[in-house]
């Protein structure tokens, strides 16, 4: 199982969504023969340092990330009719420079984009994308939402935009979580991957 690495994990810092305890995650990963794992809490990086230390203490390579919220328009727009919804996106730091960019994005999501949730937008994502790996996220991701609305043209447009920004560091995220809609989305994501070479 050494070739498998979890890249989308929520800890106790993902309120109402994460049951994993940071100190227990690397212990379990080691038991399963894994040599790396990521932390991607919702909108925050509060557990990053504790996660890093716990992984290092257990011989696991820590990958610091975040499941950010992306504003539908800009991070400055705060109209309840248009801006109360948001999409999810996974960002993973490749190195220290990526960690700095991720920290900047998460900080700006609170100081400039907070509206119901800490939000970024595509403008600052373009500005601070270097040394980050980007994954399309869960069913709440922008591409997956387009697929669920049966709008493959929009899914293609969004996937192409992210590929244009992140290049080979952009991935379509396949999940096997037992959710019926996920099965349909996975099929369409595989189709998009082949079509757009992602």
Each model region followed by its residue ranges:
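Phosphodiester-processing cores and adjacent nucleic acid-binding clamps
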Residues: 1-198
